[in-house]
Amino acid sequence: MSIDVNWRSATYGPDGEALAERIRSFIHDRFQQVALPRFIRSVQVHAFDFGTIPPELEIKDFCEPFADFYEEDDDDHTSDASEELGSEHSSQWNRTHPELNEPSYREDTAVNHSLRDPFPDGFPTSPLRSPLGEHLNPHFLPRAGTPGIPGGTSTLGYHLMSLGGLSGTQTPLAAVAGGNPFASGWSDSGMGPGNRGRSERHAGMKHQRAEPEIDTSNSTSRPSTANTLPSHPSSSSKNSGQGATGRNDHPSLHAGEHIEDPVAPGHLPLPPRMRERRPEDFQVLCHVKYAGDVRLSLTAEILLDYPMPSFVGLPLKLNVTGITFDGVAVIAYIRKRVHFCFLSAEDADALIGSEQQQQQESAGDDHRPQSRPDSSASASQKRHGGLLQEIRVESEIGRKEDGKQVLKNVGKVERFVLAQVRRIFEEELVYPSFWTFLI
């Protein structure tokens, strides 16, 4: 099945200009990361234009999206986890233990705190701690980048924030070292009887924490996630007597227990979180042929070594006036996201068959004589040479004498720039790399 693309509507107007500018900026940024040869000082990308000739698309298959398209980003994971963590904790507590908020119950159960609300009414929380609620947003939780500060970038401490406030740089170090937010002389006059009993038991268990929990022998090493556990004031006292009832995905944490770092050396990395597949998700494989007039304007500054090394730099203007492309594109639609990439020649042959097989099938269906093997082999060899089969370029520099350019390195500069354009395209748009558009 073939489809027509309204190239003008897709590439013209404010949206088309904004997309062209984003592509220009992206290519320019990638050139700033390239190691330049000695005779080139810098490369600048000035303009990008889609041209007027549209590509030819031929749909080959409808199928389920690749599994890689379902991987969740870190930002999506932390945002979803924070919202679910805050809402589930508050709703679960109010639903399963409404009687625990009564003052009489809190007074009578000063010894058993396994079901206590970590922030009862009248509890004077520390001004350096954040109560539960909207501040669990990950944008308000900067990761600790200083070695030796508990918290670090581990995700284990993140799940404990629902009971103990914030970890990392937003938790007082005194509370981390002593397991008590009032360990550094903070007043407990406003605490109720139950809270006084909790602080007394913390003092009684201090001998179990005599050894330092922060390893300062190697300041460059990443701190263990065990350092984040005492930062929540009631974890050891709430779960020391008996396990908390209700839904809890994490085991009870006792004082003095050593929790291994899940990302420490020797541990396998956790598999990525995957989005749930839905029936409306789909993916299209289409054969794309393009021989258009897309334009890309660049300038490269060439260094002259006469009369001394790097004596002066001359700008060389390069204009890409068109490309020839032949490949297989993948377009996947998943939950208001469109994922787009191209397949390498090997992957394309594995999914939709090689070009030689397609020619043989079409010839057999039409009862036409099959093409010669030489032509099929040459076409396959041309295709395996790269998705960008040809890049046309024009160069301008300084003055010309007798129709010839004076500088001798112009050809080298052209080959270098075109090789980088080809490399950027294949690294950023060929699977497993892909682009995601929100719609």
Swiss-Prot record:
Compositionally biased spans, kind Low complexity: 231-240
SMP-LTD domain sequence ranges: 1-439
Entry keywords, A to Z: Endoplasmic reticulum, Lipid transport, Lipid-binding, Membrane, Mitochondrion, Mitochondrion outer membrane, Transport
InterPro entries noted in UniProt: Mdm12, MMM1_dom, SMP_LBD
Biased composition (Acidic residues): 70-85
Biased composition (Basic and acidic residues): 197-212, 247-261
Principal cellular location given in the protein's record: mitochondrion
GO MF terms held by the record: lipid binding
Region Disordered, annotated ranges: 70-102, 184-274, 353-386
The name this protein goes by in its record: Mitochondrial distribution and morphology protein 12
